[in-house]
Amino acid sequence: MPRARWLQSAALMGALAVVLITAAPVAADAYQVPAPPSPTASCDVISPVAIPCVALGKFADAVAAECRRVGVPDARCVLPLAHRVTQAARDAYLQSWVHRTARFQDALQDPVPLRETQWLGTHNSFNSLSDSFTVSHADSNQQLSLAQQLDIDVRALELDLHYLPRLEGHGAPGVTVCHGLGPKNANLGCTVEPLLATVLPQIANWLNAPGHTEEVILLYLEDQLKNASAYESVVATLDQVLRRADGTSLIYRPNPARRATNGCVPLPLDVSREEIRASGARAVLVGSCAPGWSAAVFDWSGVELESGSNSGYRPYPACDATYGRGVYAWRLVRYYEDSTLATALANPTRPPANPQALTPPKVPAMTDCGVNLFGFDQLLPEDGRIQASLWSWAPDEPRAGAGACALQGADGRWVAASCGDPHPAACRDAAGRWTVTPAPVVFAGAALACTAIGADFTLPRTGNQNARLHAVAGPAGGAWVHYLLPP
């Protein structure tokens, strides 16, 4: 069938499906983060299980993506049951207080060691219909391209690497970026997905673009290679592509002096993004240990954890009973979700509302508890999850004319306030314990007041630090934090 007729027929099918279904009500958000209903909400309310609605949604997403790819204005490609993917939404996001605050928080965390740093990330970042239609892309984890994800403040990406025979290589294998089973299962699910050498330039070009040259990203390479030649090919591609125009490398390289007995260098959790940037690097590469790529890729298998309970997560300080506080202090804790049809089929009784989804109500709890890395599926700028990850400035803060000093309010969010107002001051001692001064002080007197109780006047740099300060400052009505607005 010609492409135009196929698009028309598919769009008609989607429209008929939604006409037959009553629209679902939008649930109230406990954290007051505005979030649209699921694209398949109208199906979810009538189906006892997830599979039919997920399948319809995947079909609608594929049609919408093909509509955009053939040059139809994206606003006209917003179909029933499909995700709403428009350039206008991304442009609006880049002008929003959410974007400004996300960038502010990243800058605050630059001096923080990686064990405490928090990253906005995506799961199976590459698995999107934005670039091409393939079998695995049709069961997508994302709607946006890698560059578009980086545009909306994602700083941790995931690429799954397989070693497959390639048509363009007349059957010779190549390193392929694909969502499929591993080599023991013949890489089932992988077909004509792109080579790593085709995908990686999206990331390099973004890092080298004006306005992005100081950004640092975390790139997780999931190893489905298990082949010495494949690892050599990966390293060669990384070295060739992740470079600046002047030829200098963007890769933060493992220090051979820290090589472990398994032949790989563990990801150093004591280093900060500030130190990585100062070294000239912009990309930290992580994965499981494989000596064949250990010159470029850190081994994070001993420091990263990802087996917690999404559904059982509770607000700070309860968090997830799977892990104690010591785990958060010394490991890189990652939570991800999976929105694919394959996952729904593997759990046929799962309800349409996925209990493992990283929803806007869960994200603040995870941020407060110290989760280091989110692996979001289907991340879009207006879906509420980026906003839910914000812990510093309150909405539309700092307000012009409100004052030049930062105050953590009674609700834990920051506002601009007059420096001459009296408030308790946020203090932190040498052991990392947060407290507030016993008496209110003006901002100029905060440092001396903290010194008097054996602590330093400072500010939270992570969501967990902010939550720990709020636990002691909230009952006092809030506290000054050591931040002055630039003139």
UniProtKB/Swiss-Prot annotation:
The chain crosses the membrane at residues 10-30, 45-65, 439-459. The keyword Thylakoid does not apply. Keywords: Cell membrane, Membrane, Transmembrane, Transmembrane helix. Its main location: membrane. GO terms for cellular component: plasma membrane. GO terms for biological process: lipid metabolic process. PANTHER family: MAINTENANCE OF TELOMERE CAPPING PROTEIN 6, MAINTENANCE OF TELOMOERE CAPPING. This is Uncharacterized protein MT2135. It comes from Mycobacterium tuberculosis (strain CDC 1551 / Oshkosh).
